[in-house]
Amino acid sequence: MDSLTLPLDYAAIERILPHRYPFLLVDRITAFEPDKRIVGIKAVTRNERYLSHQAGDAPSLPFTVLTEAVAQVGAIMILAKPENREKLIYFMGIERVRYRKPVHPGDVVEIEATVVRLRSRMGVLRGIARVGSEVVAEGTMTFALGAQGDGARPGDVRPGGRA
């Protein structure tokens, strides 16, 4: 899958990421440069289950959900590589995150993730989310790759009480 046929639609994204509705937050991938950068689209609709709404305020996409969308775009870039197809990606941390503006139903968010550092099992990505020409969120994310294997997930307690 070194050369992807763009744009990647929802079905193609489902072949790369393990996420499914309602938590698959990327609608389309429009640009892809392996190990360098990727651009994805998230169209925010009024039907999103997770829209936050305070009395008197317009509904908006929670910043945590926007952060997850950015992480998913970055994960697509990493997991699309043939050698990573059977692996899982774990985001270990986010740093220097800034939320600049709320995202509302009707907005189309363009998410760009670029590689800051990439090693065989770890890396750092920089993500920027925009609505039109305005940056709505940005930050860096550290991730690790792990093999799918015994079915254990981080934090699972095994017999004997060990994680």
Give the residues covered by each predicted segment.
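Conserved positions in beta-strands of structured domains
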Residues: D27-T30, E95, R100, E112-V116, ...
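Short aromatic-glycine motifs in intrinsically disordered, low-complexity regions
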Residues: L8-R20
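Hydrophobic core residues within well-ordered beta-strands of beta-rich domains
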Residues: F23-L25, V109, G123
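Beta-strand-rich interaction surfaces with strong enrichment in secreted/lumenal proteins
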Residues: E14, D57, Y99-K101
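Compact, glycine-rich, soluble single-domain proteins
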Residues: S52-I78, F91-M92
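HotDog/MaoC-like acyl-thioester-processing domains
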Residues: D2-T5, P18, P34, V103-P105, ...
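Catalytic strand-loop segment that frames the active site of acyl-thioester-processing enzymes
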Residues: Y21-L61
